[in-house]
């Protein structure tokens, strides 16, 4: 059941989202600014009407949906910040939703509009999120203690290999 009296509590917000909304906002602003830069300086784009682009877009979109649904089933929102999930997708990466934002959002937008520059934005987004997620991980260490520290040493942040 939805607990409306705690809905606007900063503690509730931090437990559910933490750096997600500001990070997503920063990522979308970077994508927007990159597209504006391309338009202002008439930077060459690639053709988007080719079948290989459509197939690649579809496959990456399916992968994104797979990750998001697997995340939801690995740790339902009601358990976030209350229970450390180390199974499911969380046994491969610690921040699957942020992985989607960093990689899939940029790549899918690039494929949609034919932007080379958006592909170069991926490492920048990766560094941005790596810095931002430190605060969330400190928060999680405060909740779960040594269990989360051990989890951090065994599972990488965004990419399923160390």
Q: What would you call each of these model-derived segments?
A:
Residues 91-103:
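Membrane-interface loop-to-helix entry segments
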Residues 1-86, 101-162:
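Membrane-anchoring alpha-helices and their flanking helix-loop junctions
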């Amino acid at each position: 059941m939805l607990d409306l009296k705690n809905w606007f509590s900063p503690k509730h917000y931090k437990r559910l989202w933490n750096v997600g909304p500001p990070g997503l906002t920063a990522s979308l602003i970077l994508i927007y600014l990159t597209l504006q830069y391309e338009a202002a300086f008439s930077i060459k784009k690639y053709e988007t009407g080719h079948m290989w682009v459509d197939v690649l877009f579809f496959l990456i979109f399916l992968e994104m949906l797979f990750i998001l649904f697997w995340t939801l089933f690995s740790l339902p929102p009601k358990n976030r910040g209350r229970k450390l999930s180390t199974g499911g997708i969380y046994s491969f990466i610690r921040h699957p939703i942020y992985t989607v934002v960093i990689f899939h959002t940029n790549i899918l937008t690039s494929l949609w509009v034919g932007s080379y520059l958006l592909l170069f934005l991926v490492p920048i987004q990766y560094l941005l999120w790596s810095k931002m997620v430190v605060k969330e991980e400190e928060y999680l260490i405060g909740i779960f203690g040594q269990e989360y520290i051990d989890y951090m040493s065994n599972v990488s942040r965004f990419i399923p290999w160390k």
